[in-house]
Amino acid sequence: MDERAQRKRHTLLGYGACALAGTLWGTGFYFGRIALDEMSVEAMVLYRFLFACIGMLPVLIRHRARLTPSETRTLLLAAALGVPIQFLLQFHGLVLTTVSHASLMVGAMPVLLAAAAAVFAGERLDWVGWLALCGSTVGAAMVVLGGTRVTTGNETPSLAGDLLVIASLITALGWILLSKKLMQTHSPRVVTAYTIYSGMAMLAILLFGMQLLAPLFHFSAPEIPFTQVSARAWAALAISGLLCTATTTLLWNWGINQVPASRAGVFLNIEPALGSILGVELLGEKLGPYAWLGGALILAAAITLTMRDQETQPAVILE
């Protein structure tokens, strides 16, 4: 296999990995909502990453990284942004707003990623790429708003919840770009494993530290239930950790190591689209013609970016 054919193969596999990651991420809100019926946001995120650490343990044992002091600081910053900060902001926002609102804002992520990659990582996207990204985002908006939804209880959107979700997207941008920088000198699986374990350690220190300090400073710390958690919630947490976190992060990091992050970002729109489709069962939504048209826009954007004969400049392939 010549160099050009091998590069094309890596590019297609990279897009496939990003697409699969976006698909699995799309189930995250569904399984997260199941767990949130029985525990706090903090407990749900903690257990989710505990299962993710279990899934990444073989990688951590088999692959040791030698990081420079500068790389260590970058890794810790990426872990802080990508684990405790992003997930606590996102799911606290989900509690305060509706799934449709949260999914709609996540649909803006590809354009934000493309802009950030152009500014901070020196990546370039031509007008067709920008058009595809914008079309994909419009498609995601049509999917999440293209169904009728009966609001019950306290399920109403709020500015505070929307702003928390937006803040989580900004932190996710930092995690993606910092991870891509680390993967210039380290393999994606090493970066993924060390990021998840470092982020889990930060999350555990934060939550258990709050438990210890709560009696001293007289504030209410989030409870971490265990024995009273149902088998259904444990199954949702295990799937969230093993598939929606460990597997997706590994796939995404490997994928953006093969293709520019600005172009791979279109596959992030699978998340809100699939999340909205799962909402049919979870929230009683009905998908109308606009939703189906939105799905077609997302698919067309993905095909446009992946099938165009354009040379990409991926990061150094280490595997």
Regions found by a protein language model. Name each.
Residues 43-54, 82, 87, 91-133, ...:
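Specific alpha-helical transmembrane segments that line the substrate/conduction pathway
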Residues 31, 89, 112-116, 178, ...:
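Hydrophobic side-chain positions within alpha-helical transmembrane segments
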Residues 22, 33, 45-49, 71, ...:
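Residue-level recognition of transmembrane alpha-helices
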Residues 13-17, 43-58, 77, 130-141, ...:
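Hydrophobic alpha-helical transmembrane segments of multi-pass integral membrane proteins
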Residues 1-20, 65, 108-171, 290, ...:
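Juxtamembrane helix-loop boundary signature in multi-pass membrane transporters
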Residues 24-39, 51, 87-97, 105, ...:
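Juxtamembrane C-cap of transmembrane helices in multi-pass membrane transport proteins
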Residues 23-29, 57-106, 116, 142, ...:
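Specific transmembrane alpha-helical segments of multi-pass solute transporters/efflux pumps
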Residues 27, 31-34, 38, 52-68, ...:
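Membrane-interface helix-cap regions at the ends of transmembrane helices
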